[in-house]
Amino acid sequence: MKPTDTANPDYFHKVVDCQWACPAHTDVPEYIRLIAQGRFSDAYMENRKSNVFPGILGRVCDRPCEPACRRGRVEEKPVAICRLKRVAADHRDDITDRLPTAPANKNGKKVALIGAGCASLTVANDLAPLGYEVTIFEALQTTGGLMRTNIPRFRLPPKVLDEEIGYILDMDVDLKLGHPIESLEALLDSNEFDAVFVGTGAPRGKNLELPGRYDSKNIHIGIDWLTSVAFEHIDSIGENVLIIGVGNTAMDCCRTSLRLGAKNVKVMARKPRGFFKASDWELEDAEEENVDIVVNHSPKQFVIEDGKLVGMLFDVMEYAVDENGRIDRGTAVDEVMIPCDDVILAIGQDNAFPWIERNIGIEFDEWDCPVVDETTMMCTREGVFFGGDSAFGPKNIIWAVAHGHEAAISMHKYCQGEDLEDRLPRGINLSSRKMGMHEWSYSSDYNPAARRLMPHVDLKERFKKIDIEVELGFTAEQAVAEVERCLNCDIQTVFTAKLCIECDACVDVCPTNCLTITHNGDEADLRDRLSAPADNNDQALYVSAGLPQTGRVMVKDEDLCVHCSLCAERCPTGAWDMQKSTVLLPYAADEAAAAGGQSGSSAA
């Protein structure tokens, strides 16, 4: 193999698995270190640079970082990354004087953001400090989009939403509530705005067209029902409730039902548990509240008697799974009727754009989603950009934030007459930690502590009111115990081949056998010849230049490395060094600064 190009920013970025997995590329190890030092406000601002809403995401993020966490390779559970984000938000001081502000003198460009959800708010966060006149059009009488209407208050308190959204609106953003856009064509033809961003989410819940569907008012669409609960249009439900679907919305529906008076709630899943879309922690939280999750039941018919919903008919399924772990086929082996008073359908969401005319140059695909460039976020009509669920269908908040950052860059470039594709690349900065692991690690040995459980409000107390937040958050002391589980994956092992004397000291001391000195070969050959076979092809091998004494190469399996620094401490020549990698992510402010405009970070 050719020597690894460690100058490529993506190489060390991928080694920091949590940051690489985060769509917004939040610098997780850095903010965890700041928490460890008691610098909660700094940790909050480090989060805010990339994910904009630390307090919100510290409660409801889908956590793509945690399955990627390297800690999960040395024991069962990853670091509680998401909950540590909340620690930064809960324990910070007043940070308003550290937030970006809008300049008094505008740059003469106006942008319209349709929808006041997380994607649009991220665009506003990035563009308002650059002098853009930002107008947000929101159909509802409140901000937050699906964060407010579809995430229950017992998970995400309104005061948290209001505070973090307020930080952005205070940047001289013109917010027009109760102002739906009825016609995109009319908005564009007005020539009032230089660019338009669509961040309206995926607001249409999927229906289930089965016999009896329209014969009872007690059959509800999940996201519509949650919205009605959020606005207090619904405050009760029957004692026996069936939830159809097993995604995160289904989990919110079943737990909300309990708070409205349901006594017996069942989540009905067509497939086995291993195929669920809901996050593991969402399932655990529902089961803690005694929700019954029933697998292998495929809905067949709503049972109506004398105009009243009395139950649902299900096929009981058995599934064959192929060698790749996918369901090959399903067979109905029985039929069962389960009594109920209400049914809530939570089987997915779709985009809905009745207000976007189909003759204005915006192309839609077969699923009625706009055709959007995944880099620039612009659709097939110049000057119109999409992000969040409205761009590529339902995902989650952190994806919407990432889309918002990219769209803001593109909108800035579009308004300034620049090439949208000509974007600043990611950078990487390496700084030595030569003084030993005490300079960066939490302890001089591996910390075997198990993941801390989030403390919850007692079951007897949490159902008294619908807005009692269940998760209490970590105390500062509890946070300290959890941060010590972080392996500091951004402290990289950096190798200098010309200094190596091939003494094998690093190989001998490595606790995971991730190092091998061997003759070079192709990748498949090297993976088989390592001290411990490198089976994870998604994680690259590090291969050095030829070593000066024998011409052999140093090979490192990045997948196994736990960044313990023993190789660097043992090396007699300094060939191994521990260096902190910092990924430099460009935002709209950086693009403006590079072009000679406003300086500073829009997400600071």
Tell what function each PLM region has.
Residues 105, 110-114, 162-210, 301-313, ...:
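Feature captures the FAD/FMN-dependent oxidoreductase FAD-binding
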